[in-house]
């Protein structure tokens, strides 16, 4: 049996990979592990808008209550809201039912601990072990069985928290918001209108059949069109569970996570709030991002791909901002996970405070051309490039040739017999040739 937990909880095609039975078992095992079986657990449960959410919530809740848990149901709400509300309601755990940016047929179950952090691998392993080994758990009867309560004020609690993360309001700004027919539909329209912005909406109903379909952070084309048509100051695109944000400037250009992090980090530094003068990002962030930070005297720490690794580094080093090119951005002084709504508020607030258009702010960073070529290598030899002296020497030579204005990244595929060769630099033709020759060298040496 393959590992249940991936890099972001348990995920798969709903009712096929992620069945009601599995959701039930995850509820039982999760509640038991997160309270060490010592007391009646209190668990916050939220979901995005996808149509399998009701089915999985019912099954998950049955599992939770079968071990005596008190379930707080907060309905359709962003993933970061569950992290925040778990802390606010002093719960033992939070659970989000969502597959984030994935298509409608997918769903997922993701746990948060009592402090609103995603679970470390070892805790997920304990939950998984109970399920796989079919370990018997207590089954209370009578008044020992748990109950479910709907908290109707949860959305208001989260909106008021979001407002507290910026100073002032957004009066005078015209903003187009794409909610991807997902969880932000229940929050963003109210939030931005209450802050005084003129708001134009797209995909702002929680319609499960339409979630992420040609909309949201992975498909910003309609948002770009609406920003230009309406003469808006900024466009904001969330994904299905609103833990990530991609923006569009007033000219209709996409502003990705790298640009947003650069804008926010520079602003934090100006205000003396950039902790340890450092930003955390993954190996996939563009070399242009690194250069932009360096020009401002800001340090960059890179991690493996995945916001969980960014968060681990942030908590370890006490840093205030980190994230991914995809728009997962963590403001650790405000929330314990990537929060698209907070990111959107920070970006709009910086634009209003500075009096600068988003295109002017985004000019702090130039995205360097990037070339990606797959080298075909047998699975058992994918990591051998680390030991090959000729390959290592060639990588060093290429980076020396680019003189700090480019980089080489080698990443073995996790699922295919491939090694991905990525080269970034100023001259597209030059880096294309570099990537091609390096990929050929890797194939020749490792096959």
Curated annotation (Swiss-Prot):
Q: Which InterPro entries match?
A: A-D-PHexomutase_a/b/a-I, A-D-PHexomutase_a/b/a-I/II/III, A-D-PHexomutase_a/b/a-II, A-D-PHexomutase_a/b/a-III, A-D-PHexomutase_C, A-D-PHexomutase_C_sf, A-D-PHexomutase_CS, Alpha-D-phosphohexomutase_SF
Gene3D superfamilies xref list: Alpha-D-Glucose-1,6-Bisphosphate, subunit A, domain 3 (3.40.120.10), Alpha-D-phosphohexomutase, C-terminal domain (3.30.310.50)
Which EC numbers does the record give? 5.4.2.10
Listed PROSITE patterns: PGM_PMM
What is one term from the GO cellular component aspect held by the record? Answer: cytosol
Keywords noted in UniProt: Isomerase, Magnesium, Metal-binding, Phosphoprotein
Name of the top EC class for this enzyme = isomerase
What SUPFAM superfamilies is this protein classified in? Phosphoglucomutase, C-terminal domain, Phosphoglucomutase, first 3 domains
**Which residues are annotated as active site?**
100
Q: Per the similarity annotation, which family is this?
A: Belongs to the phosphohexose mutase family.
Any idea what this protein is called?
Phosphoglucosamine mutase
Organism this protein belongs to: Thermoanaerobacter sp. (strain X514)
């Amino acid at each position: 049996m393959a590992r249940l937990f991936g890099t972001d909880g348990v995920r798969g095609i709903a009712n096929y990979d992620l069945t009601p039975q599995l959701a039930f078992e995850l509820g039982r095992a999760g509640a038991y592990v997160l309270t060490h079986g010592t007391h009646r657990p209190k668990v916050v449960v939220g979901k995005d808008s996808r149509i399998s959410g009701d089915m999985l919530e019912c099954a998950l809740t049955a599992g939770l209550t079968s071990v005596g848990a008190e379930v707080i149901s907060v309905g359709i709400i962003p993933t970061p809201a569950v992290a925040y509300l778990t802390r606010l309601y002093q719960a033992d755990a939070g659970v989000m039912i969502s597959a984030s940016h994935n298509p409608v047929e997918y769903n997922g179950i993701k746990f948060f601990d009592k402090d609103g952090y995603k679970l470390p691998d070892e805790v997920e392993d304990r939950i998984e072990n109970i399920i796989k080994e079919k370990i018997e758990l207590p089954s209370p009867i009578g008044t020992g069985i748990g109950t479910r309560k709907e908290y109707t004020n949860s959305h208001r609690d989260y909106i008021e928290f979001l407002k507290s993360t910026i100073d002032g309001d957004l009066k005078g700004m015209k903003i187009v918001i794409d909610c991807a027919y997902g969880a932000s539909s229940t929050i963003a329209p109210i939030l931005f209108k209450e802050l005084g912005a003129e708001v134009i909406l797209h995909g702002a109903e929680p319609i499960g059949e339409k979630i992420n379909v040609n909309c949201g952070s992975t498909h910003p084309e309609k948002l770009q069109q609406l920003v230009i048509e309406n003469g808006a100051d900024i466009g904001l695109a969330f994904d299905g569970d609103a833990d990530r944000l991609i923006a569009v400037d007033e000219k209709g250009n996409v502003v990705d996570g790298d640009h947003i992090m650069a804008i926010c980090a520079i602003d934090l530094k100006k205000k003396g709030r950039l902790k340890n003068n450092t930003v955390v990002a993954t190996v996939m962030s563009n070399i242009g991002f690194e250069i932009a930070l360096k020009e401002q005297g800001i340090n960059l720490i890179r991690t493996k791909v995945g916001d969980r690794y960014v968060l681990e580094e942030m908590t370890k080093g006490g840093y205030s901002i980190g994230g991914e090119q995809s728009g997962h951005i963590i403001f650790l002084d405000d929330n314990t996970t990537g929060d698209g709504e907070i990111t959107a508020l920070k970006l709009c607030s910086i634009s209003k405070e500075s009096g600068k258009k988003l295109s002017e702010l985004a000019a702090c960073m130039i995205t360097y051309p990037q070339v990606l070529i797959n080298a075909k290598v047998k699975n058992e030899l994918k990591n051998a490039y680390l030991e090959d002296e000729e390959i290592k020497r060639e990588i060093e030579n290429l980076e020396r040739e680019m003189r700090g204005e480019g980089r080489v990244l080698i990443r073995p595929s996790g699922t295919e017999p491939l090694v991905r060769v990525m080269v970034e630099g100023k001259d597209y033709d030059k880096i294309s040739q570099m990537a091609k020759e390096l990929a050929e060298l890797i194939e020749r040496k490792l096959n």
